[in-house]
Amino acid sequence: MDNQVYMTLLCTDDYTNGVVYLKHNLERVKAKYPLKCIVDETISKEALEVLEKNGIEWIMKDIIPIPEVIKERNKKKGVGIWNTIFQKLWIFDMTEYSKIVYLDSDIMVLKNIDELFDKPHMSCVRDSAKILKIPEWEGFTEINSGVMVIVPDKLVFKEMMKQIDKHASLPKNGTIRDICCDQ
């Protein structure tokens, strides 16, 4: 389909080079779908200019509000950056695209991955504790939201927005994984 895209998120200016590198990797492997980038008002004009200079179309979205309890929980765990990645949820609302393959901006694409567009909605990568042999990750079976295949649906997006408040009172991680795994 013509309206399929790779999508990434620029959650802070610090990841600008990662977005540019991701685009160059996709071009190097001759990906047939364009890369677009979600940004919000916290991204500087300079970072947006770098994206434009490198031919990366950016899409401005409002900041998704998350409860203070989640923000504080993430900061205490030393993962305050997780508070910005809720912006990924916008991909579920972007019905102008028939399918989105979401890639974190720090993903290294080594070969063409266009076949991901043939995968069904909510195909996600599982963290690879056994492959990497990291003992503290043993038994981890939840999704890694760094690579996802999404068929956008406004109703699903609205339901996910409701889940954010629900998860504020739960003793979980306060991550996008909590929201997606509950669907």
Where are these regions (language model features)?
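Glycosyltransferase catalytic domains, chiefly GT-A lineage
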Residues: 1-183
